[in-house]
Amino acid sequence: MEKRKILVVDDESRMRKLVRDFLVKKNFRVLEAGDGEEAMDIFYEEKDIALLILDVMMPKMDGWEVCREIRKNSKVPIIMLTA
């Protein structure tokens, strides 16, 4: 059975690692992005992402902007994350 993909987007590498480590232990495949623009690129390259976990405050494109853009074309579940 193929692992479900989750895209974790945060400009803080320590936060991405914390979330990634937890999800990997739960048998998910984790993709990572360090900003909103990178997240958009990955999301549209990888067609079968099951969930996005987005930081609210990021450089280039914040989590709310990413959420709005993705909602134009997809109903994928999105969890907004903030410190």
Predicted regions and their residues:
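Conserved sequence signature across two-component system core domains
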Residues: 9-10, 33, 52
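Charged docking surfaces used in two-component/phosphorelay signaling
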Residues: 17-25
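Short hydrophobic/Thr-rich beta-strand motif most characteristic of the beta2 strand and flanking loop
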Residues: 27-34, 42
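Acidic catalytic/metal-coordinating carboxylates
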Residues: 35-38, 62-65
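Conserved phosphotransfer cores of two-component systems
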Residues: 44-47, 69-76
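Active-site beta3 strand of CheY-like receiver
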Residues: 47-53
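Active-site residues of response regulator receiver
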Residues: 55, 82
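Receiver (REC) domain active-site loop signature in two-component systems and cognate sites
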Residues: 58
